[in-house]
Amino acid sequence: MFNSYTEDFLQQDKIIIANPLWNLSIPTRLKAWIDCITVAGKTFKYTETGSVGIVKGKKVLHIQANGGVYNGSDPASQYVKTIFTFLGVTDFHQLFVEGMDHNPEKADEIVKKAVEKAQQLAKTF
């Protein structure tokens, strides 16, 4: 299973990751998947000057739903961005659907705006 996740990841040109923010972290299943695709010799390599990502030519879109408003400064979204940068991905985008718990009366509006942003991103993704 470990190698099948890695191989599946390597075969894709575009990756979309969608997750909730849980206690300032990502869900455990997403963490497990990231651990499976972070493989020395497959997605990064060791060099004399340190680790180097070898994943090239992929587009990654990370969509995260947050009850509060963090503007991309939460540890979970930073972790996801850091991992894919580490792997060598340079075409990385994030979309945040946030504030639904903070402003429940605006939840429909928040989701509508996020869908509009996603539609705009889809044009170039």
Residue ranges and their predicted role:
Residues 2-78:
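Helix-loop-strand module that forms the ligand-binding subsite of alpha/beta enzymes
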Residues 1-13, 65-66, 89-101, 105-106:
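Short secondary-structure transition/capping segments
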